[in-house]
Amino acid sequence: YNRLAIQRLCKDAKVLDCFTHTGSFALNAGIAGASSVLGVDASELAIKQAEKNAELNGLSDRVRFMNRDVFALLPELEKQGEKFDMVILDPPAFTKSRSSVKNAVKGYREINLRGMKLVKDGGFLATCSCSHFMDYELFTKTIAQAARNVHVRLRQVEFRTQSPDHPILWAADESYYLKFYIFQVCREY
């Protein structure tokens, strides 16, 4: 569902997929015609499966994977002057309880700030939170704060929640857990 949403923006694009796990966003970018895709994840096992998935889909020539900690890699890529047409941030839940929301906000702010720095002017950022405790307002505020910190303007292209097979039950707040944005990133002048 959300993986399909990025496809229309990936034709001929250079894509960075952070927290790729088994590569589903990266593979969808490759299928959509991205010129190159780099998927990054800290799990060696997940990266091995992602590489197999790329091979099974005939994408090994354009979609590659790296077993690295995203928080450590993004500053290195920035220092090297790397820029991407699209950066995808799909981290695991940074909080699974109300007591750790403050630390989660720091993590989401940092990862979004780093991701925005790597997007070419006019490129795209897809960013997600799969934590129920990181509600819509707080996630949105955190992204806006990251954008101010790096002096970029965000133009919201799309907002989604989880796919229809994970319905949101109004009587169960915890069922509204996924927030998924696509932004166009514009440098402020």
PLM features per residue range, with description:
Residues 110, 124-189:
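C-terminal catalytic and target-recognition region of SAM-dependent MTase-like enzymes
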Residues 36-41:
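Conserved SAM-binding motif I beta-strand of class I
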